Structures are given as structure tokens and as C-alpha cells.
Amino acid sequence: AKRLPVTMAEFSRGCVFKCDFCASKITLALGYRKKSPERCAEEVKHMHDLGFKEFMLADDIFTSDNKWAKNVCDEITKTNIDMPWSCSNGIRVESADEDLFKSLRKSGCYRVSFGFESGNDEVLKLFGKGGRATVDQAKTAVQTARAAGIDTNGYFMLGLSPDTEKSMNDTIDFARSIPLDMM
């Protein structure tokens, strides 16, 4: 955290994906719902008015809809509130683009977290990522976020059913090779 006190925010709930390892498809089985960008900005203003100096966004997949995510960032920017925030979850590597990260940064976002899961494309497919996310996309996402001035965090998993010794070593090598600020 950059400033205390910090609070949590949630602009969307649920997930449109059904990754094998994730509990969201069961615990949040009502599907994917998101608030309007205006409502999100109102909540940020309310948190600020309550005395919070920073928030952590807890959405499972903030960037499943880049247009919506950019609109949320634009609405937060319009409030002119100096309130840094981080996205502790929910940045999809396949959705990462320069415009998105510029919007995130402009709105006060200073850190994003990526669920890389594995450094092996075959394991990513077997995990239920469906070929949507690849190791190359993950590398590009980190570079693009960092170029926009955003710190990066990565989540990895080892030892799930499709993993082999080779795929786990691929994941370890991948984690060592990318310039993350946290993992």
C-alpha cells in the first residue's frame, strides 16, 4: 500500500470463464455482473469521503471487457480525486493493451496483478484457460504495464493435475525471466 488507510472495492462480481482450478465458478455461480462506470466512480468518491487514502480492487476479472474497464478508469479520472489504487486480481494477459494500461495509470492505478498460473502453454490449455492466455501474451502484458508506469505482480501455480516435472520447471524459469515487482 502507498497510503493508509486502505479499503477494498469491487466493481464487478463473478467470472465469464470456467478455469478448472478456480472456485469462482462455484462460489459466485450467479454469473458475471458489473457496475456502471459512473457507479464505480461514485464508490471511489464515497471511499475518499470516508477518509480512505487508497483502495485495492478485488474483481476476479476487471479486464474481461476492456471497453468497460477503460470507461471505469475514465470516470475515476474525472473525479479528480488523488487516490492511488491497485488491482490485486483480474488483469487478463490476453486483454492487455497500451490504451488500457494508460487509462489504468491515469486513474491512479499503480499496480496490477496477473494470474499467469503456468509458464507452459500446454498446461494453460489443460487448466481450462482454453488457449486464451499464452506465455507470450503474458510476457507482452508485463512489458506493456511496465511501459505505462504500472508495477506488476504475478501469480503462479505448481503441482496441479496436468503439471509434470518439465512443466513445473518451465513455470519456474518463466517466473524468473519476467520483470515482476512482486510474486
Q: What residues fall within each predicted segment?
A:
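Radical SAM [4Fe-4S] cluster-binding motif and immediate context
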Residues: A1-Y155, D173
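Catalytic cores of alpha/beta
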Residues: L100, S161-S177
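Gly/Pro- and small hydrophobic-enriched strand-loop and loop-to-helix capping segments
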Residues: M183
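Short glycine/proline-centered loop/turn elements that form peptide/ligand docking sites
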Residues: L158
